[in-house]
Amino acid sequence: MADLIDLLHVGRRRVIATYLLAGDEPALVDCGPSSCLGALEEALRERGLEIEDLRHLVLTHIHLDHAGAAGTLVRRNPSLQVHVSAIGAPHLVDPSRLERSARRLYGEDFDRLWGELAPVPEASVRPVGERVLELEAFPTPGHASHHVSFLTAGGACFAGDA
């Protein structure tokens, strides 16, 4: 079952969230930005978990509000596998272009809004196929060309920004 975690972006509720998929191999669907790591850590602890307990990070797309903390999470937990579309994967491995364009857009507010944007080691990246864990994956381009949505066996959909 998926457990919604509000990441309290810049102290505001209902702006950015992640879903925790509990079980033998705990997973997050999207992770939010590094600026929200404190809220994520607190919510995981309330559920008896630490970042180091996570095994999978399933990303709908690479925008900062959905995937900005991916590299920081992998640095803290090198066994974390990051599932992302093949189109989005290179931007996680080398986020320099993504960061450059975001810094132009957000200016001096970038660090406060998004925090660190660390690279994800290529060895930690798993391109999304037809299935990720128990989720059916399917492309949902529009908001982003690399956007992927995930459907549970029970019919719930993790749609990101689709």
Predicted regions, residues:
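Active-site environment of divalent metal-dependent phosphoester hydrolases
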Residues: 36, 62-67, 90-91, 144-147
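Active-site neighborhood of phospho(di)ester-bond hydrolases with catalytic His/Asp-centered motifs
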Residues: 29-32, 54-61, 83-85, 140-142, ...
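Short histidine/acidic/glycine/proline-rich micro-motifs that form metal-
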Residues: 27, 87-91
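Core dinuclear metal-dependent hydrolase active-site scaffold
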Residues: 20-21, 129-152
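Metallo-beta-lactamase
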Residues: 90-138
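Active-site metal-binding motif and surrounding structural segment of the metallo-beta-lactamase
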Residues: 38-84
